[in-house]
């Protein structure tokens, strides 16, 4: 029976900027094995991310939600990112009219093949929400990104860790959560200014498998 490592949370970062078509911010990656850097972009409008780099290396687009009232979230990733402090540089398809925020989180001991094991989205009109999905393996982590018409960014529910939140005419935020035992899970936000349109996206990563003595012998 396979055994798995414990995912290690490395670092978070984030930014919110004005009406631009490109921007950058720094993220610091520590030392560890089987690393992943995840970039999250939440926005409203006819905007898409054209490209993202970290230390000049391109990230891969892993999941983009649908649009609800023009709200969306995007998730990009880079496997084995360089250690140290480097720039995350983002290029947008067109100028974002001050309606976005971006965050990043890095982990170690993460499965490197097809890293987003579960993807999910939920949209609606509410002053708070709980997005339900199913995890598929013990020890997974969920990363979510949301944006809404609220002029208050809202608060993550218990068990989630905030990565970045932005309060403006359209607010947004992102977080991560350790999922524990596989099965039914939720992520959520509360405290929006009133019942307003929102979109929330989720991706799930899973721990890397331990390489035991038997597996090592098979490779000899």
Q: How should these model regions be labeled?
A:
Residues 1-220:
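Primarily extracytoplasmic/secreted proteins
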